[in-house]
Amino acid sequence: MPLRVGTGIPGGGQRWWGRWHKSDVGGVVLNIKSEQHLALEFDRMMQIPEASAIMVQPMLKGTELFIGAKYEEKFGHVVLCGLGGIFVEVLKDISSGLAPLSYEEAYSMIHSLRAYKIIKGTRGQKGVNEDKFAEIIVRLSTLLRFATEIKEMDINPLLATEKQVIAVDARIRIEKK
């Protein structure tokens, strides 16, 4: 089975909201198909400054989604969603809502995206499981109600198919009072 390999860089290898990402420094490799290739990439990635570990995952396919959150002093936690991967930075098509969110609010966030046709499925491509996507948004917003020390969170990408939505990478910034 093809593999995905990523570095374990403190802070997720990304300065918040896309100034640089671990993929920008060669910290992500897709479709590793042999032990030799894996060993070469491991050695190379461990030379990346601040790299402390390597994560090896099965190579999954699906539509890349994004869910994030940011604590705003005046409002509390703002939950964000949209297409993930590079699309969140390039398209800047993000929907937001204040935690805690209901399922109705989560669906409204999803449906308000300009890229909703991609999520729904278009031009012969199957859509993603909106129920699972909405459920993750609601559960994240509920978590934030109780985990007030979370100041920023980024789950990107989530890989979504018509059956499932799986988190591939995540980053959380915590501040204790």
Go through the PLM ranges and name each one.
Residues M1-K177:
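ATP-dependent carboxylate/acyl-activation modules
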